[in-house]
Regions:
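N-terminal Rossmann-like NAD(P)+-binding subdomain of aldehyde/semialdehyde dehydrogenases
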Residues: 1-108, 302
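Conserved C-terminal structural/oligomerization subdomain of aldehyde/semialdehyde dehydrogenase
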Residues: 9-15, 194, 232, 287, ...
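Residue-level signal for inorganic ion chemistry
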Residues: 10, 46, 68, 90, ...
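Rossmann-like NAD(P) dinucleotide-binding subdomain of oxidoreductase/dehydrogenase enzymes
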Residues: 101-241, 367
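Structural signal for hydrophobic packing residues in well-ordered secondary-structure cores
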Residues: 35, 39, 54-61, 65, ...
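Short, well-ordered beta-strand elements within core beta-sheets of diverse protein domains
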Residues: 13-19, 34-40, 121, 231-234, ...
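A short hydrophobic/small-residue beta-strand
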Residues: 145-147, 324, 407
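ALDH superfamily catalytic-core signature
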Residues: 13, 205-347, 410, 466-471
Length: 474
């Protein structure tokens, strides 16, 4: 048995059994059995089930948002945004699978997409509704069947969304849910009868999966992993706007987005010091409250264990010589040890660990010039998101061509994303772009289909071929 706990008050809100290896095997066999008939349906026929599912999501939007908020600690207004984003992706996913045609000298040449088969989808805890269904929708559209394993920290919202899929009339076996911890995930990822795996989560787990799948090149592995994301601020006139975008980039979702700014890089000037002073003063004013608080910007992190880990990270940096500009503290008086205040720490004089951490802690580095800022931005094995706040187009051009990242932002918060653009990184941040048309590259494989509606001899036969004439009586 395992349980889900509301991080705002430590209340147990869900209990259930972990799926055993035998139950995982049964789910995969159901998906395999359902695959041939599901794949035979046209995309339009498959889309009708998805459209029905999304209508049900819209009807239950507030209840789903409340469940999401209770289970993750995400403030309620942000939980509503996640449910809305999940719905809005569908139209773009559908457009990605429209057939493309080309003309040959006789007949037609089509580029079509064929489904892989049975896909395992692993969801993260920070966006437990939006991200996994961002994989599930295009995979179903393409004709795959799915076994979905959500994060062990978010079983309740995953169960509720899954029940809406079932209510949509989806044929039995097309989408299967297995709940559990690591053993359940291992049983699914190692199952010999899955054709691919879509994983969103930590780079540590992603590397394990990458090694595991190295011996199975016939199976597709799509990884959307973490980041140690840099934000450079330089030559900005509107300091208040830059401070606002920095707060949004670092502390939204209590710092629990893979695209959040982890490293703030400043060229050491008097203007940068003004910016930093205002950032610290403004961050002190951030309202932290329960997930149901409509006026709060930050709720708790996902668990008390995660909060403890983050506080230890801050302590380690201080012991190395980092200087807290705004100390991240426990706010247990709000209801649990999972509540933290935002923290800003000057790490200019120390070497920091190049590791992703999920939480409201921003590391600051002061450098001598813009070239040094870009070098510091690239001082990471990750390559997910990177941003520049600057009035200078010249600096942005230098930044764009110099920085290594899959998501590059200029005068925008790092955590923003467009459903019509590829989402994903380079390096240790993964190999997957689970957005828009790029999802089609992972959910189906392209097939060139050259077609003519009749057979006829060419005007001139190839050299060395002589055909006998068929007898009229024969």
């Amino acid at each position: 048995m395992f349980e889900s706990v509301n991080p705002s008050n430590n209340e147990i809100i869900w209990q259930g059994a972990e799926a055993s290896e035998a139950e995982v095997d049964l789910a995969v066999r159901k998906a395999r059995k359902a695959f041939p008939e599901w794949a035979k349906l046209s995309m339009e026929e498959r889309a009708t089930f998805i459209e029905k599912f999304l209508e049900l999501v819209k009807e239950d939007k507030e209840e789903l948002a409340k469940t999401l908020s209770d289970e993750t600690g995400k403030v309620i207004w942000e939980a509503r945004t996640e449910i809305t984003a999940m719905v809005n992706k569908f139209a773009i996913s559908k457009e990605a699978y429209e057939t493309r045609t080309g003309i040959t000298n006789k007949g037609l040449s089509y580029t079509r997409h064929k489904p892989h088969g049975v896909i395992a989808v692993f969801g993260p805890y920070n966006f437990p509704a939006h991200i996994p269904n961002g994989h599930i929708v295009p995979a179903l559209l393409a004709g795959n069947t799915i076994v979905f394993k959500p994060s062990e920290l978010t079983p309740l919202i995953s169960e509720k969304v899954y029940q809406l899929w079932i209510k949509s009339g989806l044929p039995e076996g097309v989408l299967n849910l297995v709940q559990g911890k690591a053993n359940t995930g291992i049983a699914l990822s190692k199952h010999k009868d899955i054709d691919g795996l879509f994983f969103t989560g930590s780079s540590k787990t992603g590397l394990i999966l990458h090694k595991q799948f190295a011996d199975t090149p016939n199976k597709i592995l799509a990884l959307e992993l973490g980041g140690n994301n840099p934000l450079i601020v330089n030559e900005v006139k509107d300091i208040e706007a830059a401070v606002y975008l920095t707060i949004q980039s670092a502390f939204i979702s209590s710092g629990q987005r893979c695209t959040c700014a982890r490293r703030l890089i400043l060229v050491d000037t008097p203007e940068s010091q003004k910016f930093l002073d205002l950032l610290v003063a403004s961050s002190k004013n951030i309202r932290v409250g329960s997930a149901s608080d409509e006026t709060a910007f930050m709720g708790p992190v996902i668990s008390e264990a995660q909060a403890s880990k983050l506080l230890k990270t801050q302590d380690t940096l201080v012991k190395k010589g980092a200087k807290p500009l705004l100390e991240m503290n426990s706010l247990s008086e709000l209801g649990s040890e999972a509540f933290l205040s935002p923290g800003i720490i000057d790490c200019t004089d120390i070497d920091t660990e190049d590791e992703e951490f999920f939480g409201p802690l921003l590391q600051v580095k002061l450098v001598k010039d813009f070239d040094a800022a870009i070098a510091e931005a690239n001082n990471t094995k990750y390559g997910l998101s990177a941003g520049l706040l600057s009035d200078s187009k010249e600096l942005y051009d230098q930044f764009y061509y110099g920085v290594k990242a899959g998501l590059i932002n200029w005068n925008n918060q790092l955590t923003g994303a467009s459903s019509s653009a590829p989402f994903g990184g380079t390096g240790l941040s993964g190999n997957h772009k689970p957005s828009a048309f790029y999802a089609a590259d992972y959910c189906a494989y392209p097939v060139a289909s050259m077609e003519s509606d009749s057979i006829s001899l060419p005007e001139k036969l190839a050299p060395g071929i002589k055909l006998e004439v068929l007898s009229k009586n024969g």
